A protein has these predicted regions:
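Hydrophobic faces of stable alpha-helices that mediate helix-helix packing
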Residues: 10-14, 49, 88, 92-95, ...
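Non-cleavable N-terminal signal-anchor transmembrane helices
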Residues: 1-31
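Short, helix-capping/interhelical loops that line the mouth of catalytic, cofactor-
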Residues: 1-4, 45-107, 139-140
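Short, contiguous alpha-helical
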Residues: 23-66, 109-140
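Hydrophobic packing residues in well-ordered alpha-helices of helical domains and bundles
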Residues: 3-10, 34, 77-84, 120-123, ...
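A structural signal for long alpha-helical coiled-coils and helix-turn connectors
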Residues: 18-25, 96-99, 138
């Protein structure tokens, strides 16, 4: 898959996750991730989107170079799904504008090249998996 194919997954899957979170409520338990609530899923995806955005934005070649303050302030519950959507938009905008020639840091010993596609693929997968998890809270 190419970058645009991954980007075509991230935004809509995030929108579906946010809609499911709004429908289920942030306190709903998630059967496929025991001990987690919808709020936990929303915060997790929002955090990993921001982490990937920071890794690409700072052109880190080692994960230790990613600034530790990439999260900013966590959202109040009423703003959690808007915060989630905003993070996905920032991630996609960052990936779209990034240089494919740079070998960005990843957490794999031998990542595929170009490593920008690693981040796009990973975030598409992560978002999709947790969107499905969120839907399990509604019995889907």
């Amino acid at each position: 898959m190419d970058l645009n194919s991954y980007l075509a997954v991230i935004r809509p899957e995030t929108a579906l996750l946010a809609a499911t979170a709004d429908e289920a409520g942030l306190d709903a338990q998630v059967p496929t991730t025991p001990g987690w609530t919808i709020s936990d899923l929303v915060l997790h995806i929002g955090e990993v989107h921001r982490w990937a955005t920071a890794a690409v934005t700072c052109k880190a070649t080692k994960l230790s170079q990613v600034p530790g303050d990439f999260l900013g302030q966590l959202p109040e519950p009423a703003g959690a799904t808007a915060w989630l959507r905003h993070g996905a938009d920032a991630l996609c905008d960052t990936l779209e504008g990034a240089d494919l020639a740079i070998e960005y840091a990843t957490f794999l010993a031998n990542p595929p090249s170009p490593s920008l596609l690693f981040w796009a693929r990973r975030q598409a997968m992560e978002t999709t998996v947790h969107r499905v998890d969120a839907e399990s809270s509604l019995g889907r």
